[in-house]
Swiss-Prot record:
Main EC class the enzyme belongs to: transferase
EC number: 2.1.1.181
Chief localisation class: cytoplasm
Designated name of the protein: Ribosomal RNA large subunit methyltransferase F
GO cellular component term of the entry, any: cytoplasm
Pfam families: Methyltransf_10
Domain of life of the native organism: Bacteria
Database matches in PANTHER family: RNA N6-ADENOSINE-METHYLTRANSFERASE METTL16 (PTHR13393:SF0), SAM-DEPENDENT METHYLTRANSFERASE (PTHR13393)
GO biological process: rRNA base methylation
Source organism of the structure: Aliivibrio fischeri (strain ATCC 700601 / ES114) (Vibrio fischeri)
Family of this protein: Belongs to the methyltransferase superfamily. METTL16/RlmF family.
Gene it is expressed from: rlmF
Function of the molecule: Specifically methylates the adenine in position 1618 of 23S rRNA.
UniProt GO molecular function: 23S rRNA (adenine(1618)-N(6))-methyltransferase activity
Length: 319
């Protein structure tokens, strides 16, 4: 049994992340003119956008994906999760480092490397970044037909994206079964699990984020208009994206249990974990079912610390 936990508190994005430093708004506007109306000069004399405005955040995402990843077409339906691109890129780059561990220290690239994004959502962002940065092939799964439809539309309407397939999970109780085919092998799986245990909890979380953003902007002297729509895009999300019965812990424990059936078809299973206290619970479950190697990888974006846990049933992995 090999267990490792990162004890280093990081303060910056992954060194290969393209989104370090300030946004180059002239370049982003050149890539996506839709961003221009949302860019304004703040009290410090810097160009920025109002991050409390969901349309501004959506336009910024469009520009980032067009400029950095040559993905000119990107959109999401109203009310679906609009993820921050830099943090999503960090997960991908850290997975690349993880794959190097079982590839003689070299990051594997190309279409033969295959990943599964559990809960791809309508935004398709992980698949876009992994495909464009490392040319990996991807399968994205989701229980929401609209998410699959939109993610597939994005993948099929950007010529730069190759080897991306989206599959509908027809049974909400299954995570891998019904998605991973009998003869398929995946180098890794990834997941941003539902955080909340109920819709009421998810709504309360959205409102709390909005209040915190308002307070932070007030401290900095920015004018702030309270968002009336509790499902603002940058804090939005459908049921499958935000909550499930039992919340994050129940979901990741189910993932651990169901991973056993696919131990020979997946090199590395991984999942983000928002609540730090859930890491120990996942470790206990993985050890109980006989996982050989478990690793926790910390990531950071400014003051925000996030993490994902990775595990493999392969023995003798030298971490």
């Amino acid at each position: 049994m090999t267990n490792t936990k990162s004890n280093v508190t990081k303060k910056s994005l992954h060194p290969r992340n393209k989104h370090t430093g300030n946004y180059d708004f002239p370049a982003l506007i050149k890539a996506c003119a839709e961003l221009k109306p949302f860019v304004e000069t703040n009290q410090y004399g810097n160009e920025s956008i109002n991050f409390s405005d969901p349309q501004a955040v959506k336009a910024l995402n469009k520009a980032l994906l067009a400029h950095f990843y040559n993905v000119p077409f990107w959109d999401i339906p109203q009310g679906y999760l609009c993820p921050p691109i830099p943090g999503r890129a960090d997960y991908i780059h850290n997975i690349a480092d993880l794959l190097a561990i079982t590839n003689e220290g070299t990051i594997p690239t190309g279409k033969k490397v295959k990943g599964l994004d559990v809960g791809v959502g309508a935004n398709c962002v992980y698949l876009i970044i992994g495909n464009r940065e490392y040319q990996w092939s991807f399968v994205g799964s989701d229980i929401d037909p609209q998410s699959i439809k939109m993610a597939s539309f994005i993948a099929n309407n950007n010529p730069s994206l190759k080897g991306i397939e989206c599959r509908l999970q027809k049974n909400e109780e299954n995570i891998f079964k019904g998605i991973i085919k009998p003869t398929e092998f995946f180098d890794f799986t990834m997941c941003n699990p539902p955080f909340h245990a109920s819709e009421a909890e998810a709504t309360a979380g959205t409102e709390r984020k909005q209040k915190n953003l308002a307070a932070n902007k007030a401290k900095k002297g920015h004018a702030f208009q309270e968002m009336q729509n509790a499902k603002a895009l940058n804090f939005g999300g459908q049921k499958a994206e935000l909550w499930c019965e039992g919340g994050e812990l129940a979901f990741i424990l189910k993932m651990a249990q169901q991973s056993r059936e696919f131990s020979l078809q997946v090199q590395w299973f991984t999942t983000l974990i928002s609540k730090k206290e859930n890491v120990a619970e996942l470790y206990k479950e993985l050890e109980k079912i006989g996982v050989k190697t478990i690793k926790t990888i910390e990531m950071a974006q400014g003051q925000k610390i996030s993490r994902f846990v990775a595990w493999t049933y392969q023995a003798n992995v030298n971490l």
